[in-house]
Amino acid sequence: MGNRVSREDFEWVYTDQPHATRRQEILAKYPEIKSLMKPDSNLIWIVIMMVLTQFVAFYLVKDLDWKWVLFWAYAFGSCVNHSMTLAIHEVSHNSAFGHYKAMWNRWFGIFANLPIGVPYSVSFKRYHMDHHRYLGADGIDVDIPTDFEGWFFCTTFRKFIWVILQPLFYAFRPLFINPKPISYLEIINTVIQITFDIVVYYVLGVKSLVYMLAASLFGLGLHPISGHFIAEHYMFLKGHETYSYYGPLNLLTFNVGYHNEHHDFPNIPGKSLPLVRKIAAEYYDNLPHYNSWIKVLYDFVTDDTISPYSRMKRHLKGNEVQE
């Protein structure tokens, strides 16, 4: 159903990603930006409150009719759980406790993972560092869709289904593109998460468990906040690899919309990225950006020139990939 997209392959490029060069230029001109490279202690308390909020929600939905369980999973839980994945993104950059307490960040990420229902935090950190270091690298950056995704999800209707199923593709794509040996922290993350899920089931019942899992599935699928998955790096304009979003949903997502700023300065917490843009305005104001993630989702589905193939991809230079 729907028109078939015109693109039949990724956009292969033979230049380095732009972020390292821009970072060097900005720091040379505005060295005061280095003062923003420090942890955000407020993140700790925000995450704790979000976790406790979902714990209360688990209790409140345990005796509701199923239709209301699913309603609140989408209307409320999805926003909290998607926001929590972006809190975990912040924690993966050591923004909670700083780089000198890296393990504190790993344990805190496992704690933040609890209301999501699926072990995620430790694996995300491992793959996300590759995404920054090797942006668009073939066989390394698992943020890039597989060839199957680009080939199959090539009509309006299929792209719509792809948007709904995004959490599943993000979960299983690493196994096909860049499988890594399981680490002991991933095992710990999994054991703690499964134990927590079992406790929720036995103490509160199946409805609370379904609410938790459905909130994650809904929030990471067809949801306004999920527009950031596509907005960040899908090539709506030829030659532009990363795009920022400056709309109101940044308030719920730890400023993940400031994505050019984030890739330029991954050591700066999300709360300070607007300051980066303000200080170095001439580097960002003229870059293409978005003001609506909902429009991004709509345009992705309906535009016949855009598909999962609409990503800039590059061959890895050299053979060494750092863990």
Swiss-Prot record:
Where's the motif Histidine box-3? 259-263
According to the record's subunit comment, the protein's assembly and interactions are: Interacts with RLBP1; the interaction increases synthesis of chromophore-precursors by DEGS1.
> Gene name, please?
DEGS1
Name-wise, this protein is Sphingolipid delta(4)-desaturase DES1
According to UniProt, the reaction catalysed is:
an N-acylsphinganine + 2 Fe(II)-[cytochrome b5] + O2 + 2 H(+) = an N-acylsphing-4-enine + 2 Fe(III)-[cytochrome b5] + 2 H2O; all-trans-retinol = 11-cis-retinol; all-trans-retinol = 9-cis-retinol; all-trans-retinol = 13-cis-retinol
* Species name: Bos taurus (Bovine)
Q: What does this protein do?
A: Has sphingolipid-delta-4-desaturase activity. Converts D-erythro-sphinganine to D-erythro-sphingosine (E-sphing-4-enine). Catalyzes the equilibrium isomerization of retinols.
Task: List keywords of the entry alphabetically.
Answer: Endoplasmic reticulum, Fatty acid biosynthesis, Fatty acid metabolism, Isomerase, Lipid biosynthesis, Lipid metabolism, Lipoprotein, Membrane, Mitochondrion, Myristate, Oxidoreductase, Phosphoprotein, Transmembrane, Transmembrane helix
Q: Name one GO molecular function term.
A: cis-trans isomerase activity
Q: What EC number(s) is this enzyme filed under? A: 1.14.19.17, 5.2.1.-
- Entry's transmembrane regions: 41-61, 68-88, 102-122, 152-172, 184-204, 209-229
Q: How is it modified after translation?
A: Myristoylation can target the enzyme to the mitochondria leading to an increase in ceramide levels.
Q: Which Pfam families match?
A: FA_desaturase (PF00487), Lipid_DES (PF08557)
According to the entry, what is the taxonomic lineage of the organism? Eukaryota, Metazoa, Chordata, Craniata, Vertebrata
Q: Where is the lipid attached (N-myristoyl glycine)?
A: 2
The UniProt record lists the keyword Nucleotide-binding: no
Compartment(s) of residence: Mitochondrion membrane; Endoplasmic reticulum membrane
